[in-house]
Amino acid sequence: QRQEEPCATGPCCRRCKFKRAGKVCRVARGDWNNDYCTGKSCDCPRNPWNG
């Protein structure tokens, strides 16, 4: 990973760049809501409304 590349892998990373904020990174299941990328991380944070 080069210095100017923010990420290499992860559900919110595409072509070594963060996916835009609001992009679904984990689809809702059962009573849980969708989880969304923040635009600042390669990780997929849990939706706070999911408990």
Swiss-Prot record:
Cell attachment site (motif): residue ranges: 29-31
SMART domains: DISIN
GO CC annotation terms, alphabetical: extracellular region
Record PTM Pyrrolidone carboxylic acid, positions in chain: Q1
Subunit structure: Monomer (disintegrin).
Purpose of the protein: Inhibits fibrinogen interaction with platelets. Acts by binding to alpha-IIb/beta-3 (ITGA2B/ITGB3) on the platelet surface and inhibits aggregation induced by ADP, thrombin, platelet-activating factor and collagen.
Note: The disintegrin belongs to the short disintegrin subfamily.
Protein name, per record: Disintegrin eristicophin
Higher taxonomy: Eukaryota, Metazoa, Chordata, Craniata, Vertebrata
